[in-house]
């Protein structure tokens, strides 16, 4: 077994988070540097009071990440709503309790923030890989149908600018 730590990512953790995202697929290539756009975006993320990025480390190795946004709300007696995005575990570390540990911490933080509800969208392709079972085991219910509209392609600069450093 390994020593698992789930913590809030800080300014110094950009490369760790990018590395986990790169390793979500077997054989994913970990970037050597972040692009200017990635650094600017990360700076905005870590400075935001509404966003929390979680970083899971197994024996000090970054192996998982998830993001929670707490949105103020004038409904539900002004209780905020939490949104979960980008739950990722490195391919070689899946099915070891890492996503569950991150989500349990995230849910505890959402409760502490007084959130009325936590919303999580999961792609249909994850119905067969265990992710939906995990979410259900943590109390999430498939009670709504989500819709998504992509307004633009991801900026090419996020990928190509990495080479420019």
Predicted regions and their residues:
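A short beta-loop-alpha structural element at the N-terminal edge
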Residues: 4-19
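A conserved beta-turn-beta hairpin within the catalytic core of GNAT-like acetyltransferases
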Residues: 73-84, 94, 143
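Conserved acetyl-CoA-binding loop-helix of GNAT-fold acetyltransferases
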Residues: 86-89, 95-108, 133, 137
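Conserved beta-strand in the GNAT
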Residues: 55, 61-70, 83, 88
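A short helix-loop-beta-strand connector motif used in the catalytic cores of GNAT acetyltransferases and
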Residues: 43-55, 83
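Conserved active-site alpha-helix within GNAT-family acetyltransferase domains
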Residues: 100, 112, 116, 123-145, ...
